[in-house]
Amino acid sequence: MNKKSIRDVDLKGKRVFCRVDFNVPMKEGKITDETRIRAALPTIQYLVEQGAKVILASHLGRPKGQVVEEMRLTPVAARLGELLGKDVKKADEAFGPAVQEMVAAMNEGDVLVLENVRFYAGEEKNDAELAKEFAALADIFVNDAFGAAHRAHASTAGIADYLPAVSGLLMEKELDVLGKALSNPDRPFTAIIGGAKVKDKIGVIRHLLDKVDNLIIGGGLAYTFVKALGHEIGLSLCEDDKIELAKEFMQLAKEKGVNFYMPVDVVITEEFSETATTKIVNIDSIPSNWEGVDIGPKTREIYADVIKNSKLVVWNGPMGVFEMTPFAEGTKAVGQALADAEGTYSVIGGGDSAAAVEKFGMADKMSHISTGGGASLEFMEGKELPGVVCLNDK
């Protein structure tokens, strides 16, 4: 990575405005999944050890520029204190005189959590005045929120106009892993692209066709490709306006010598429920009033074999409706193949794929699970991320 990180700057006694991603799921004021808080710990601990005054900023939910009581970061600050084993202060605002007083009272190694930055309308507009207010609190800006790096907001990008800007350890790791995958991958390099819609994955498929040896597709988006081959797909998801594009992608794969894998059999159902009746049929035999909801057992074996023989696998998007038990086997099988593959480096591209490996208890068997769904997708499309571009070069 050619951007400066916290390892490249002197932090002792400095006020550090550190943008983290504490956007954790909450239920009735309780945190239901603290993965994102834990992911930020190495950076926070490093800043503390180096004697910085650590000012943490994050969003939580979508309050749309106003104060929403249940989206305050108070429970997050409390949990962070427990995880760090130290006293963590919490401000009621994200800038202003009261916050400046709290910062002025900080000693080296102290940690202060600011209030939800999206309580201010200027945050998502990347308002320069708000960015200046944030910058006034600190000497250095650290961006460790890879999950929000694709957003040009006041606390992720705008603030970098007024302070030296470096990455945290989590951001640095994300950029190193994803950057190497795209620029200098170990081969064979396989991408697994799933999820519901072709339109969400157009950019990533197009960009990866130039880089991968194998492209595997699954999930709802696969049926548009199946239809493009002239097969009937019953009531399965299909984007008719993307059929020509699907044909173009399959042709491009052929021209570039990329092995293009799509389902040969699928799990079909007549109803979406936990107790649904399912059948397994070949891909060209989906009846008119049935819907494809998962990849079938033959497909799972083929995909597992490709995975096993790959050196690098990037996975973005599930193979079926994994949230429901009868339609989860395909996604589980891909996760299992990655967990079992020896000598294969696995990169899970955030979002639903990350949720799936967590759900099936396979997370600790993956080499790298990205903390950013949208951010990792845009990175894999070859786009520049505003929260990265704004950091100082080495």
From Swiss-Prot:
Catalytic activity of the protein: (2R)-3-phosphoglycerate + ATP = (2R)-3-phospho-glyceroyl phosphate + ADP
EC number: 2.7.2.3
Modified residues (Phosphoserine): S183
Protein's cellular compartments: Cytoplasm
Binding residues annotated for substrate, in chain numbering: D21, F22, N23, R36, H59, L60, G61, R62, R118, R151
Family to which the UniProt record says this protein belongs: Belongs to the phosphoglycerate kinase family.
Record protein name field: Phosphoglycerate kinase
Organism: Bacillus cereus (strain ATCC 10987 / NRS 248)
